[in-house]
Amino acid sequence: MNSTQRFEHKVVIVTGAAQGIGRGVALRIAQEGGCLILADRSDLIQAVLAEIKALGALAIAVETDLETYAGAELVVSHAIAEYGRIDVLINNVGGAIWMKPFQEFSEEEIIQEVHRSLFPALWCCRAVLPEMLKHQQGTIVNVSSIATRGIHRIPYSASKGGVNALTASLAFEHAQHGIRVNAVATGGTKAPPRKIPRNAQPLSKSEQVWMQQVVDQTIDRSFLGRYGSIDEQVNAITFLASDESSYITGSVLPVGGGDQG
């Protein structure tokens, strides 16, 4: 186990925990003594659960669709049944499905982007809040994006702008109840290929060009001229989730090599 036990005896929900940043966050919290509820709609979450149990940490996994309020309620009910309370919620579900100019998006595609990248955070905050209010304490970290100012992802950008507004307003509304709410605006992040792609369709030549333009813009706007690593994002997320950030709330922390979004 990690010598730093920032999450000892803490009950932590991590959504979107089956791969990428979510998996990295879950493993770090397990190494630091946390009791975990892993949530994802993919059965890949079971492999992450096995990894965490191999570390000797306490964890359960809930396969559910967090684009629905019922899915968020299911996660909370499992957490309460298993541990009796919730100390930390980390909302990590989201990600751009398509990359193309706004006029190329259909109505249905726009709806899918918003459902994917805004509603899971809204639903999970709403579902967990009564439990945190009951105990007059809690910490929420929303994973946002520096793409709130960027090209070819406007529905996703608007969704993450909504996550930032949710973060600020919820922090303002519930600070008096001992609940802190912050966000990490992740920049471009190097990660293994997704086991379940957000968009499984082959890219057209135009879509390949548009995607490369997004990559180029991301690197150009980073002062450090590179993508970040999963560990670098995990460092920021777990800092805001821990008591080390006890005097920080209502903040959006950009982690994009200097790109402020």
From Swiss-Prot:
Its EC number is 1.3.1.25. Pathway: Aromatic compound metabolism; benzoate degradation via hydroxylation; catechol from benzoate: step 2/2. The keyword Oxidoreductase applies. Substrate binds at S145. GO terms for biological process: benzoate catabolic process via hydroxylation; fatty acid elongation. It holds the Pfam family adh_short. The keyword Hydrolase does not apply. NAD(+) binds at residues 13-37. The active site is at Y156. It is an enzyme of class 1 (oxidoreductase). It comes from the Bacteria. Gene3D superfamilies: NAD(P)-binding Rossmann-like Domain. Keywords: Aromatic hydrocarbons catabolism, NAD, Oxidoreductase. CDD domains: DHB_DH-like_SDR_c. One of its GO terms (molecular function) is oxidoreductase activity, acting on the CH-OH group of donors, NAD or NADP as acceptor. It catalyses: (1R,6S)-1,6-dihydroxycyclohexa-2,4-diene-1-carboxylate + NAD(+) = catechol + CO2 + NADH. Homodimer. Degradation of 2-hydro-1,2-dihydroxy benzoate (DHB) to catechol. Belongs to the short-chain dehydrogenases/reductases (SDR) family. This is 1,6-dihydroxycyclohexa-2,4-diene-1-carboxylate dehydrogenase. It comes from Acinetobacter baylyi (strain ATCC 33305 / BD413 / ADP1). The gene is benD.
